[in-house]
């Protein structure tokens, strides 16, 4: 992030770092407490109306949305826990390749809107902490260009069941406090 003089690095199997400090995705588990980052459509042919519907679906269920910068920076912020999730369409492999390694090495998940890990050539990308990623799939899968209506419904149902099963299996826990330094390090 040149505006903050931060350097994000990752090596497969060795972790993700910001300025030589280990980073991890956020610990939040409830979508309504999360900040989600995204990009905005700007190219001729982008379906602006569809993107606005997608943003409305996400905004109604989260604490807010941000537009920090390039997709690579958005993914770096997910990896550092500054934001809890990310989604965008119209992306090329060079937009997300480095950021995808940051996210996975920081403990997050990344894929297309139906949750499949094969996303590089799909021009749609979604990332987040595992529990948040699982809650974004049913919201965003209906906007995927790569799944039929039946597939989209099945993905939403499976994600909903997975979330319910996880919530039922875990006893109510105290809210995770914000880690010292994390909030003050956030760029917004």
Task: List the predicted regions and their residue ranges.
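Acidic beta-strand-loop-alpha-helix segment within the catalytic core
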Residues: 1-75, 122-188
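Anionic group-transfer/hydrolysis microenvironments
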Residues: 3, 90, 97
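Hydrophobic residues within well-ordered alpha-helices
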Residues: 76-79, 97-105
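Alpha-to-beta junction loops
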Residues: 80-85, 105-109
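Active-site neighborhoods of divalent-metal-dependent phosphate/nucleic-acid chemistry enzymes
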Residues: 84-93
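AMP-binding (ANL) adenylation modules
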Residues: 115-119
């Amino acid at each position: 992030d040149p505006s903050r003089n931060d350097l994000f690095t990752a090596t497969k199997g060795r972790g993700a770092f910001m300025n030589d400090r280990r980073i991890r995705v956020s610990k939040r588990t409830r979508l309504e407490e999360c900040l989600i980052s995204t990009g905005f459509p700007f190219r001729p042919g982008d379906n602006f109306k569809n993107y606005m519907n997608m943003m409305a679906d996400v905004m109604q269920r989260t604490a807010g949305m941000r537009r920090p910068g390039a997709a690579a920076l958005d993914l770096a912020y997910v990896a550092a826990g500054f934001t809890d999730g990310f989604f965008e369409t119209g992306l090329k492999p060079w937009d997300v390749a480095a950021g995808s390694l940051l996210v996975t090495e920081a403990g997050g998940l990344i894929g297309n809107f139906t949750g499949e890990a094969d996303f590089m050539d799909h021009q749609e990308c979604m990332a987040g902490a595992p529990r948040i990623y699982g809650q974004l799939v049913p919201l965003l899968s209906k906007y995927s260009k790569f799944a039929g209506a039946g597939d989209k419904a099945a993905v939403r149902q499976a994600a909903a069941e997975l979330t319910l099963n996880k919530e039922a299996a875990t006893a109510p826990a105290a809210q995770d406090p914000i880690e010292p330094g994390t909030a003050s390090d956030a760029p917004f």
